[in-house]
Amino acid sequence: MDHKKFESLIKQLYSTVNELESMFPGRHFTPDGHMVGSIGESLVADAYGLELMTASNKGFDATSTTGKQIEIKASQARSAAFRSEPEHAIVIKILPDGSFEEIYNGPGSLIWRQFSDKPLPNNGQYQISLNKLKILNEQVVESMRVPRVI
């Protein structure tokens, strides 16, 4: 894959969003839903050298070169949602310029423990704030992280 072309296309997309929002004040053109998920999964797969599974794969989105199953969560808001305990999770926040900030990169068990005393929400998804994930990320030792390749 052409990493530079991919990066350029994502930046163009977010630049277009910013231009449209400037042209039409009060209107939001922010990508959401499946588009954000697919963009996030692609950004992470590219940056960490992961192999993506088919879309909507149950339980994980990609595998690492060592075979680790990775759930990828991308947000433009303040939280991420989990339906089940992942083996490993990488959570990112997509920034307005199309780049991303790594919020969490570590074992899924550390996240899942946060839900242990909570009833399952009606929508079947536990929510966790990006701020809480940043705090949890500080507890992850380097050897437990999936390293970036670019």
Language model regions located:
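Nucleic-acid endonuclease domains
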Residues: M1-I150
